[in-house]
Amino acid sequence: MYKSNYDKYPATPMEGIVWKGWENICNQLKSSLSAESCVLVIECYQGVLHDELRDGFAGLHADCWIDTQSLFKPVNEIEQMTYPYVTDDRLFGFRTHLSYKDFFNTDKLASAREKIRSAQGLTVVYGHGAAWVAPEADCIVYVDMARWEIQMRSRRHEINGLGVENKAEGASYHYKRGYFVDWVVCDQLKKQLLSKADYWMDTHIAGEPKMITGDLLRKGLDKTAHQPFRVVPFFDPAPWGGQWMKRVCDLNPDQPNYGWCFDCVPEENSLYFNINGERFEMPSNNLVFYKTRDLLGGPVESRFGQP
């Protein structure tokens, strides 16, 4: 009988601490914030489950909580602003030049920043663009999300795009908005935070949050860039074929077929760290962003620049 040796869960082995569960995560964050008055930024990538995160971080017992969603421009303004990039075409669009500053209402932003400056105790700035709203934060937590999981959540109509309410839209339109607008905007800020975030979070499995230090994240990316590695493959049904992959890749035999296999697309695939036996997931794009020269070489970076 054929036995597949295909590794569906490749990972970089690491040693370090992983905080699991909301109680442990909140306790660690509170213990790291020793000052009487401090600002904690919780920056979120598009596609996170905000209801779960808000409930989970309630355990911080913040004295002042600012949700960046309340500072965004109205939905209709954001739709109008992003239309030239998203367009009406089902497939084609244009890569945006927008950044987070274009999404915020200037008056609300100024009021929020003044509130942050005058607040006492623990102030939490949560949501998309939180690190831009509070650039002088005492501690930065980044809640990441890989694009394959974003696509799965889009298919289940669980998430909205940046500043819009489009859960009911088809997954292809979600993907298009993400590709041309949302992910571009999120990645601009992420590139700045990869080198300085204090903590990094994996919430890809709902109800099972995990957190590591930013130092451990950067150590893992450096290690991965200097050794052979694989990104995490994913598979998807399609109208054609797919029986061969079931057998060779040890896939779910109950699915009708598998027509797609993505095994090296950094923009869409995940990267795993195996930290003392605990799997920690992130977008493999993080490696490309943080270790561009080490990963691709000097000539490639010099010719094409940062991704």
Predicted regions and their residues:
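NTP-dependent small-molecule kinase module
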Residues: 1-35, 51-56, 60-61, 156-159, ...
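ATP-dependent small-molecule kinase phosphotransfer cores
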Residues: 2-20, 63-122
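Catalytic cores of nucleic-acid editing and processing enzymes
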Residues: 35, 59-63, 111-115, 128-130, ...
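Short hydrophobic/aromatic beta-strand immediately N-terminal to the Walker A/P-loop
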Residues: 39-43
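ATP-binding Walker
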Residues: 47-48
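ATP-dependent NMP and nucleoside kinases share a basic, alpha-helical "lid"
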Residues: 60, 110-163
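Extended, regular secondary-structure scaffolds
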Residues: 146, 151-156, 163-186
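Short, intrinsically disordered, charge-balanced linker/junction segments flanking boundaries
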Residues: 299-307
